[in-house]
Amino acid sequence: MTGPVPDARVIDGKAFAAGLRARIADAVPAFRAATGRAPGLAVVLVGDDPASAVYVGSKGKATVAAGMASFEHRLAATATQDEVEALLRQLNADEAVDGILLQLPLPGHLDEQAAVATIDPDKDVDGLTPVSAGRLALGIPGMVPCTPYGCLLLLQDRLGDLSGKDAIVIGRSILVGKPMGQLLLGANCTVTMAHSRTKDLPALVRRADIVVAAVGRAEMVKGDWIKPGAIVIDVGINRLPPADGAAKGRLVGDVDYAAALGVADAITPVPGGVGPMTIACLLRNTLVAAHRRAGLADPEGF
């Protein structure tokens, strides 16, 4: 007996990410054979934020499952700027570490920008250092932020060549919006960058073949904003207030999913769309960084 037929309009980020992680795991033995070691990812957690601790744990498990070495470093919430940066410099010098991820946000007394800038750009698997941002803007090979890169992979899997597509990115954060715009430009899209001050946003969205929503407002993008046949990538993750009698509210994206599903050619759900791609692309970046640091060609297919 077979289960229900999946809705072809729903982009299954979970399944795509699982396939990507499997391909990464398949590529690790060749690197190990060439270098005598596994690619290594170090994650730094400052403080005891519960959500950050969960993220760090899931990243560690995924790293080990891919056959890579996982290094976890925890500092107290009272850690000083000097202590954080000293640990990052220590990891920069550690030959067993190919990728460094500083879990954000940091406690409020710390300077996130200065800490991130301490990371060796060749180990910057989150793609957040000023050097990584500059390389992306100039089209020079480097590390690309994981979430927007995951979005690009989902789009290319669905559409193939993106050349000539009209794309709109709603949101201008350094984590998603800005690098997403650069990646779409690099893929030969015509890109509109929108944000909270953009005038007549619905009209701009209605022109777009590709909509990437990363603004952090629950269900802000309405179904009647979407052009029929568009591809919608919803990066948002927002928890609504609990309904009567419920312990907690449901998770929704930045797009009114139910309404958009009836108009779009395809859309990512929340959860289960973009989220799983982030960790998969973190592993991909670690694999690529390891090859480049070892003087090897980028692994085929990545």
UniProtKB/Swiss-Prot annotation:
EC number from the UniProt entry: 1.5.1.5, 3.5.4.9
Designated gene of the protein: folD
Quaternary structure and interacting proteins, as annotated: Homodimer.
Pathway: One-carbon metabolism; tetrahydrofolate interconversion
Matching Pfam families: THF_DHG_CYH, THF_DHG_CYH_C
The protein's name in its UniProt record: Bifunctional protein FolD
Single GO cellular component term: cytosol
GO molecular function terms noted in the UniProt entry: methenyltetrahydrofolate cyclohydrolase activity; methylenetetrahydrofolate dehydrogenase (NADP+) activity
Chain sites annotated for binding NADP(+): G171, R172, S173, S196, I237
Kinase as UniProt keyword: no
UniProt GO BP: L-histidine biosynthetic process; methionine biosynthetic process; purine nucleotide biosynthetic process; tetrahydrofolate interconversion
Species: Sphingopyxis alaskensis (strain DSM 13593 / LMG 18877 / RB2256) (Sphingomonas alaskensis)
